[in-house]
Amino acid sequence: MSVVVDTDIVVALLDTGDANHEAAARWIVTYDDDLVTTPLALAEMDHFARCEGALEALRRDLERGVYTVRWWADALDETLVIARRHDLSLADASLVALADRLRTDRIATFDRARFGALTTRAGMPFTILPDAG
């Protein structure tokens, strides 16, 4: 199975001073499924990692295959439709499109308000990870 990974999870893992660092670190060591993201989210990750002085750590994770980056022929079209429909950034919309493409309802994010208000193509709510508890 796959879980779609949002930028804030990766930033929290890289930045020990991030308010969500401990929660992200506890979650990541218990998770064994494929962690997948999009090039749009990766660009955000790169930007924030650079700002936090963690760019090399992010690049090492990418080289080791910690995260898989997926894109497909009509990804941009799907992303634009979702972004307009839900007033999302292109990065966030691309993650929703990716979840649909992978047929997963699991998104790793600390942005519960935004992703918790969205549903899968089948109309089911996304499972937001890590658990709020």
Where are these regions (language model features)?
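Short beta-strand scaffold positions
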Residues: 5, 36-37, 70, 90, ...
